[in-house]
Amino acid sequence: MTNSLTTWDEPELAIDWARLGHVYVVGNGKGGVGKTTTSAHIAALVASDGARTLLIDLNGQGNCALLLGFANTERDDKGRNLFSAVTAGAQLTPVRNVRPNLDVVPGGQYVRRIASVLSAEMATKDDAKRVHLALAECLQAIAGDYRVIIIDTPPENPLLSNIALCAGRFVIVPMRTDEYSRQGLRDIAADIRGMREHNPYLMLLAVFVFGSGTSSKKIRREMAKSVSEDLGQSSDMLLESFVRHAESVASEMVKFGRLAYELEQEIENNPKYWEVRKGSAKNVTTVSETSRLVAEDFANLAAEVLTRAASKRAQMIEQGEWP
């Protein structure tokens, strides 16, 4: 409270945490571990089951639009609305029905400006709190329209990642089986602890391996032990589900703007090899058969994540800890 006649207190933010209990943040302090691919797949798979879903691309590259096939179209605002919402309190206006039941708030070049704008507004502790809760404040206004909300976070941009954490309930961490990913896990674990000052209900839900060989079972078992050591928690934090390495599928997803399960549906349209050889094939575009297996990986992952979240929610409700 101030007694000055020429200044006034900024109104204290009122975050209704009950509205944000279905927000999932996909993050890791390291890039190249599958955050965007995972975010897009979980969001689209949930939507395909009939649940209204929102995907927020808090990333300056805007790759969610690329994966979903609407990059560089009139629907892709390159993050302009997200920038206005987070920095100026504008209403979030998602792109509707990018897939049936799936809305998207695109990222892109305007998102890159968010951190520099907000960094200049963190002079006091109260200012810092307001900045960190900027996404939570604008998201809570539309959160009730959706059953699930997924936030894709950027690598190596602590402020944007922390803004996402302050709007989320559950954190999902993809990682590869290398030391760089382990450091990224330790970094985001520290961020989660720090951001609980602003978001007391934030929790690490699960860790999973992305881009692993199907025969690398021993490596994944060792990774489970490493995750337990890094987090100081039980080794079941690492999910059984993992996403296999499939370079051809990753390339085709970007090339065609289709997710793995959508590519799978096109396999039956692949031309026969003898038709291609004879030059009689009507369709010369082929889709990797491996897309079927990758689609199954993501379906298993999404199911395990949602089951674990539901179990955690039920446990907290029983204990009187869920807002």
Walk through the language-model features, giving the residues of each.
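P-loop NTP-binding core
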Residues: 1-323
